[in-house]
UniProtKB/Swiss-Prot annotation:
This is Large ribosomal subunit protein eL30. One of its GO terms (molecular function) is structural constituent of ribosome. GO terms for cellular component: cytosolic large ribosomal subunit. One of its GO terms (biological process) is translation. It comes from the Archaea. InterPro entries: Ribosomal_eL30, Ribosomal_eL30-like, Ribosomal_eL30-like_sf, Ribosomal_eL30_CS, Ribosomal_eL8/eL30/eS12/Gad45.
């Protein structure tokens, strides 16, 4: 099985943001996860430890997969096409993206 490169993942994130339904930000992601919404959470590598623990706790309860991206929050924001840092994003609908195929679950 071929492991996806970071460029493939970055492109999949951007396509999901452009064509699908994605929630940006840790507070909104956690809120939606608590309501059982979302198909995949992507967390930046430098996300705050306490926030990351909350995300992992609620995703475990809701059985939502989590992918820890190797990019910083500033880089993840740029990947999403935003001029601000993004520590976490929740994919509600992937659109034309293959983002749900990432399998680096922690």
């Amino acid at each position: 099985m071929r492991r996806r490169s970071s460029m493939d993942i970055n492109r999949a994130i951007r396509v999901a943001v452009d064509t699908g339904n994605v929630v940006l930000g840790t507070k909104q992601a956690i809120k939606n996860i608590k309501h059982g919404e979302g198909q995949l959470v992507i967390v930046a590598d430098n996300c705050a430890k306490d926030v990351k623990e909350d995300i992992f706790y609620y995703t475990k309860l809701s059985e939502t997969p989590v992918y820890t991206h190797q990019a910083t929050s500033i880089e993840l924001g740029a990947i999403c096409g935003k001029p601000f840092p993004v520590s976490a994003l929740l994919v509600l609908e992937p659109g034309n993206s293959a983002i749900l195929n990432v399998n680096n679950e922690e």
